[in-house]
């Protein structure tokens, strides 16, 4: 019964996540958040009468006021390294009321959760589904009506800004409706858990891939379900998938990856060679050694999912002499060649090697999901932004120009990170169910990756250079790199223009005591590796670019591929139900199918990855307050004037959008994750 109950918890973020305090919080707490936003908005109106200023240029009264505000902020924004399930990682001890999500976010997220409920109910027997379908349909209709009211209120406030105050009463009524809707969503999940637990089974190995397709009841089956076994598609994941940050160019193969010249030529042709490919910059490697305890190699037994496996493979890719696109060459399913044989991509005529090769690719995809979710996604975006959010609130007064700039890029971050720690990472939570490693090892390894992430080395241009993939002449087809640099440079110019408004010289930077305190908190309490004192304007620009890019574009690039690329379990999964293949030959489709995860894992993947990748809240370049009527953040005419820094930034983003759309017409497949129109300003989901 417990096994089935957890299976059904995959319906929509798990029953407790919806019904209890973890995701939507209690109505009273939520109303308190709205009251706090109203207070903050009132203060903001007063602050807007005085342009932001550096502390050294404030008068005595202003300096005392700044100090008082920061003293009170430090009582609310409190560091801890003992947060449940992420111990050792600097986090907020609790989420302040003003950091809870607003009505706009709640409506969007609730809508996606209802979609997931409808999808799950569609897979139930008709007799059981009927009652839930009616309730879910009613919820969908009521949510749509609430969205329409919300949009109408915004339109009225936009057309008549002076009427915004009179609209607050109607907005308060909308809040009450939304709270009631959220309560109904939670009750529906509870009812499904109670009534349907005896109607769902986990399926078995004998039904092939049908059980994985069946979990897409009303949701669209991703295209990857029909292409994931294709070798070119497998290679394309490395440059345009959810984890485009591991592939690196190599001049020689590592000693523990003994691919022979003859094996290479079997794949790339008799007229090519390893030496020639290396010399012409055509060899590219994936090495998952960094996974550590996320790849225990041996069997791991779990109550809910049975036996699971994960490894730290090495995979070689190469470009042909025409550089048309990466091709997989060989895979070693672990770090030790003595225990893991080499799998070389077979020719079409080598049918006896086909399923062994597919099994080796599955081992790579298991490692890929582990690396992506725990390192690239959780550690290097969510948890990095957490540190900068806390430091900003604790050390930069609301009147500081950098606080005004950065705060919108942290909207929702503390809230969603607390949800990740409490819902995704506990024992028997989503990650424990979906991933092979023991949950304690997963928690510790993800935390270690966050603490080891070097801020300056993580900057996009530096990361590309360090991996030897920065030159388009060597690797022409790399959508993440090419589109990412467009967005990076647009943000960098915006940061430079903004800094120039408030910092007349490098001396202004070094004289800024609040900035110095911010740096100190990031280094000391935030434990951001590699961070160092800021001594001039150009360095400040690079730092701001990295902070903004991480919270917005980088998170978008690794988060929003999840629904289309990661919800179909056979294409990628963080655990295998069978060990890595021990021989390239003699394997069958049945052997490969044994590696597929339990249906429980497939359900969990659909629900969590569809949710996380389907909520788009806010947009890069659109700086608005979090409380109704979501007024503009900037009021300083030096920033907002026609042709000024903000308008130029928004114009550049439109140019980037047009360039990417043009590029997509010529690409193997459109890469849409870094379109500025699809990049939220903050990490809020």
Curated annotation (Swiss-Prot):
For activity, the cofactor(s) needed are:
Fe cation
> What broad class of enzyme is this?
oxidoreductase
Kindly give the PROSITE patterns that the UniProt entry links to this protein: LIPOXYGENASE_1, LIPOXYGENASE_2, LIPOXYGENASE_3
* pH relationship of activity: Optimum pH is 7 with linoleate as substrate, and 8.5-9.0 with oleate as substrate.
Pfam families in alphabetical order: Lipoxygenase
Q: What's the Enzyme Commission number for this chain?
A: 1.13.11.12, 1.13.11.58, 1.13.11.77
- GO terms under cellular component: periplasmic space
User: Where found in the cell?
Assistant: Periplasm
> Which residues does the annotation say bind Fe cation?
377, 382, 555, 559, 685
According to its UniProt entry, the protein's GO biological process terms are: lipid oxidation
Per the record, the major location class is periplasm
- Complex formation: Monomer.
Q: What is the annotated role of this protein in its UniProt record?
A: In presence of oxygen, converts linoleate into (9S)-hydroperoxy-10,12-octadecenoate (9HPOD), which spontaneously decomposes to the corresponding 9-hydroxy-10,12-octadecenoate (9HOD), and into 13-hydroperoxy-9,11-octadecenoate (13HPOD) which spontaneously decomposes to the corresponding 13-hydroxy-9,11-octadecenoate (13HOD). Also active on linolenate. To a lesser extent, is also able to convert oleate into (10S)-hydroperoxy-8E-octadecenoate, which spontaneously decomposes to the corresponding 10-hydroxy-8E-octadecenoate. Is almost not active on arachidonate.
Family of this protein: Belongs to the lipoxygenase family.
> In the UniProt entry for this protein, what further remark is given in the free-text comments?
In vitro, under anaerobic conditions, does not transform linoleate or oleate into the corresponding hydroxy derivative.
Protein name, UniProt field: Linoleate 9/13-lipoxygenase
